[in-house]
Amino acid sequence: MAGTNPRAARIAALIQRVVASSIERELHDKRLASITVTEVRVTNDLQIAKVYWTQLGHEGHEEGERKRAQQALDQAKGHLRSLVGHKAGLRLTPQLQFVFDEVPGEAHEIEDILAVAKKRDEELARVRATAQYAGDADPYKHDDEAEAEGDEFESDEE
């Protein structure tokens, strides 16, 4: 959303709803079939709205589909802006900039890394459960043991 301007935050939410519903209902472009609008950020002066979007793609074809979807969004930018202006009732409608949202893809990568780390932790826990100490379980001398040894030496000397 926007920084500190509550009006910009409200307009960003409105733009997100209008753009998402328009892509789904009014734009009959196959390139936009699997588009999801994830977030909209509006500048505090309400001049520019960055529309972040993501796309569910088929393995191996994501890059090409993403480029085609970006082209379709750029072509529909004027129509979407006029719809936003009409539904929002704004004197000046923000300029729409469509930006591909990298966060979901990065989130999947992080989840994969965490899954590998969890698997390693489980394996380490299994190894640790059957592990034995190389020497004594507690190799350090404690004060009560040192005193007992000291008493033995004193009794030998007497």
From Swiss-Prot:
Pfam families: RBFA. InterPro entries: KH_dom-like_a/b (IPR015946), RbfA (IPR000238), RbfA_dom_sf (IPR023799), Ribosome-bd_factorA_CS (IPR020053). It is found in: Cytoplasm. The keyword Transferase does not apply. GO terms for cellular component: cytosol. Keywords: Cytoplasm, Ribosome biogenesis. Residues 145-158 have a biased composition (Acidic residues). One of its GO terms (biological process) is maturation of SSU-rRNA. Residues 130-158 are annotated as: Disordered. GO terms for molecular function: ribosomal small subunit binding. It comes from the Bacteria. One of several proteins that assist in the late maturation steps of the functional core of the 30S ribosomal subunit. Associates with free 30S ribosomal subunits (but not with 30S subunits that are part of 70S ribosomes or polysomes). Required for efficient processing of 16S rRNA. May interact with the 5'-terminal helix region of 16S rRNA. Monomer. Binds 30S ribosomal subunits, but not 50S ribosomal subunits or 70S ribosomes. Belongs to the RbfA family. This is Ribosome-binding factor A. It comes from Bifidobacterium longum subsp. infantis (strain ATCC 15697 / DSM 20088 / JCM 1222 / NCTC 11817 / S12).
